[in-house]
Amino acid sequence: MKHLLKMLDMSQEEIIDILNLADQLKYELKHGIPHPMLKGKSLGMIFQKASTRTRVSFETGMYQLRGHALFLSADDLQIGRGEPVQDTARVLSRYLDGIMIRTFEQKEVEDLAEYGSIPIINGLTDFCHPCQILADLMTIREFKSSFDGLKMCFIGDGNNMANSLIVGCLKVGMSVAIACPDDYQPDKEVLDFAAQYGDKFQMTNKPLEAAKDADVVITDVWASMGQEGEAEKRKKAFHGYQINDEVMAQAHEDAMVLHCLPAHREEEITTKVFEAHANEIFEEAENRLHAQKAVMVKLMA
């Protein structure tokens, strides 16, 4: 594994290896055991999309691994002033040991990997969010012990989260049910991938149907960054796609709820459900740190 570009590229073995290492790193951190696995290494962090959790978790993770993280905003790079991505990739490869990029276009991430000579980590694109899904899988296994026999239900926008959850959960052996409005379905490439799993994958526009017998229920905001102009239109389209008591009544009694945050309470999830599952949601947020540290060690050590 040379890069982390999208979940579609990862094998089940690679996913499990990262989760196992993430568990180990989490244990060591909690018990004060140093792990300077990236001592002397430098990670460049490119942010075309702002983020609290991504920046803090990667920067803190590199510090705990005894490496150095360098924040690069769009204003710090020549890409915004016309330099081709392939040139930026080749220059940064001479200075850094790895790049994490959070941006809009998946192609930009793929181009960095193609033209650079160092590991590239996808911190989020409009197509996928692999770091978040690794944290989600880590959290699910932490609370449920294994993936065997579990069903994951996602309700809401068929966005980067849905795309990555479908692939990641199917690859580790879970069943997957997705409920989205017809005009907001996941990417065709992802649906084609899921089709090979037969009845382990269900696509519907009925949230209650998707939530039936679910062990894990997940949602995301209705309007992602860059879609603020569509907020009112999306509120109408996603009316009825809220995680609430009615939805949770369809899931198993001990079902988990996850949300990648930030949450818009009383839109995609009620405050009551959010607070009832806050322990799981904030453990998921913490696990971004541990999962991303595992990714960096695997790619950069």
Regions found by a protein language model. Name each.
Residues Q48-T60, E142-T219:
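Glycine-rich phosphate/diphosphate-binding loop of Rossmann-like nucleotide-binding domains
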Residues L92, L112, E209-A210:
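Structural alpha-helical scaffold elements that stabilize or flank donor/cofactor-binding regions
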Residues D97-G168, H259:
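Anion-binding alpha/beta catalytic cores of soluble intermediary-metabolism enzymes, centered on
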Residues S42-L43, F47-Y95:
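Active-site cofactor/substrate anionic-group-binding motifs, chiefly glycine-
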